[in-house]
């Protein structure tokens, strides 16, 4: 997986270079316990806030291209170790559910490794489907995930 912090910094820079995308917020970095597959190293996680005119599907395609072209990601083990994983959590108030994209991200409200860094940059942001703020979702979360600010 290489230098996890450097990978996050490179990913932030790559996303910031996308046309019609401006990084307007970056959470602190967190070291988090793996979810879904046991026996693997911890992950580093962060959340970016973007201002973009790109439609959701096009933004997702560009994020996936960064994963493959810059970080040589090949998808083998679901939830397995990888150098970088760029997820699109929200796109304004968009609600999408198709073969390629689900917005809001279907498991974001269940994951401390998503909610904690999201809380750091937009605690009052409301989940478009649940109608609850990030702060409310985080306070209600019952999870044994370890999430440590680095």
Regions found by a protein language model. Give the residues of each.
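Flexible, gly/pro- and Lys/Arg-enriched active-site loops
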Residues: 35-44, 54-60, 64-150
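A structural preference for short, hydrophobic beta-strand core positions in alpha/beta folds
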Residues: 25-26, 149
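Short, mixed-charge, low-aromatic patches
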Residues: 15-24, 88-96
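N-terminal beta1-alpha1 ligand-phosphate binding loop
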Residues: 1-21, 27-31
